[in-house]
């Protein structure tokens, strides 16, 4: 267990890989320009020219970078998974090309993100469950603390190994529910205190259905304005973003007690259906065998959907859009729309109107 959590060889790390990360200049006029940010959600770090140009052209100053997932393995043990690899491994590239694609762009604030599968906070018959010590059950009092320690240590190790400096915040992404809330919140409370000792804040993602629940014990939240419908239903035309699904959840955003920023979707899905039944989301051509009678449908938010979401958030609580985050910085995603369309998302204040 300890060896796996501390084993960083699978990351293909390069010493002194990154240039120094510097925070946004203190001289920037934050009163007139909102924070422009994006998620980087992949298992391999590659900063090609299209991503670099997008970052520079749209003045993106903050990247939320997925570092690794946390899952239960076949034996029920909680383990890190799908750790981000920073070295480019394309054998067709020269050493110089690999280095350039591995470098972190200058002037970016990096926020490491860890996705934790909700099952990690549920009881498990094969091992001690992650469970709040308030339950009074034996053998689990320190389990949330152990998980918090392991996650923070792994983040710090990855930062150090890759020369990622000046990290001021870390983030946890988890689709927690009422049944896991107590254990998850205790874990967050411990992690927040540990991060504070390292002079870092803690943020967490907030899904729409979680808005009606007690806010998590973190410094701030990121409201996920996507995955709003049921992708498994062929009749659901807008599973990524449909404001008809969103509207009931955001009516009381003005009184939500946790500071929020909002993340908006750029991505699309290719969804496979067989005889009207959901088979899966196709990420690569080898994911599923496709029969002649199968249906492959593309689900994607249009610019009108994204702008409606931005305006709706403005109407409910304009402060949330003081930081606009795009999900995510993928080559296909950043080519979906025209440059001026992305600017419309970022320049929401000048394009907002009452709805």
Language-model regions, residue ranges each:
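Conserved, mostly hydrophobic/aromatic
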Residues: 63, 172, 221, 262, ...
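Short, acidic/polar
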Residues: 44-56, 144-161, 210, 305-314
